[in-house]
Amino acid sequence: MKQNYDNPLRRQCFDLVRLAPAQFDLAREALLRLEPEKRLAHIRRVIVTGCGDSYLAAAEAREVFKHYLRGTGCRMEAVRAIKAARYLPLDENASDTLLIAISASGGPARIAEILQRGKRHGCLTMALTNNGASRAGTTADLAYVTNTPEFPDRMPGLRSYLASMMGLFVLATVLGEVKSGKTGLCDELRAELEAYNGRFAAALDQMDDSAYAAACAMKDSKGFEVCADGPLFSCGEFISAKYAEVSGDKCTVVDSENFWHVNSIMMPQNAYGTIDYVVSDERNCERMAQTISGQVEKLGRKVLVVADKPAAELGVTAPVMECILPVPAPQFRFLLPLYAFVPGSLVAGYHTALIEEPYFRGGGKFFDPSINTLGTNEIRVL
């Protein structure tokens, strides 16, 4: 019975539809306190970085920045933390650059290093964090605090991931207003979010049923894989991380083309539970349908298709499990990453409950500071 396998990841997923609109409002209030019209008007380059899930939040915000900064002469780029710290070229006086480092805790050494490097090069630095008093929050010129409400069993952090994305989405609209002189962009996005949030909430029980059925069917898999293209690739990386954190399973991430170059030859070929993400009106739909059909017909895999339409309507010719995911209209498709990770996270949560594995292997070595040096690694400001 599904109710016997309720789990912390599932409870976080179900709370997200309550959290999302509230988190938007909290982010907006926090950002306006930083006086963006005065502090951000000169910005022409926005660099957003972070470690782990925080980088993925940055990657998932690319499209919303692209939408709201179009025609302003300002551009956004999302880069991984080690690149921002050690490899990314910065001018000696990059005063027109806003460097944003994301960390919910604000504690990682690499985040502090990035902020110090940004200051050395004349950037305006911002910490997007849930802890303004942290090392990141006190190192940055600006502490953009998410103020995410407390929640029981909040690890691993789906809520902090949503909060980081929401903070960036709000920043994109406000910066768009500042740079373009337009008004109402933030209000427009808030209204679209509210509408999409309602559609997603109405479908959540059905997605939960689909996720439980898929987890049961895939329970004995040797490993897992997420196949997704375009912006949803980062969603796949997030789901992969959840499997590692909650059940300790390896979960690879691949796009529909590279699957046939590499991952299709992983052995045993039928041993990997697979979650495929598809959107019916996007240009890669046909290729995704071909890949999904091949995963089942040629490799014998158990496959869950997460899409906005039944698999047969996408062109899938093989029998698969299905999870219907509402998607926003094309002009606001950039909202999809705020929720797309939920079906895969539900499957990971149920899988972990079914095999009775403690999250993070019960602690132990994962939290040993002599092994996990995220907060103590040497800082080198280049």
Region annotations inferred by a language model:
Residues D6-L9, V48, S54-A61, G236-E245, ...:
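Conserved phosphate/anionic-ligand binding catalytic regions in large, soluble enzymes, centered on
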Residues R11-R44, Y144, E150-R159, S164-G273, ...:
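Active-site phosphate/pyrophosphate-binding segments
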Residues A41-L193, N270-G273, Y277-P330, L346:
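Glycine-rich phosphate-binding loops that contact phosphosugars or nucleotide phosphates
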Residues F238, R287-A289, V316, L336, ...:
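Short conserved micro-motifs at the rims of enzyme active sites and ligand-binding pockets
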Residues G300-L304, C323-L382:
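Charge-biased C-terminal accessory regions appended to nucleic-acid-, cytoskeletal NTPase
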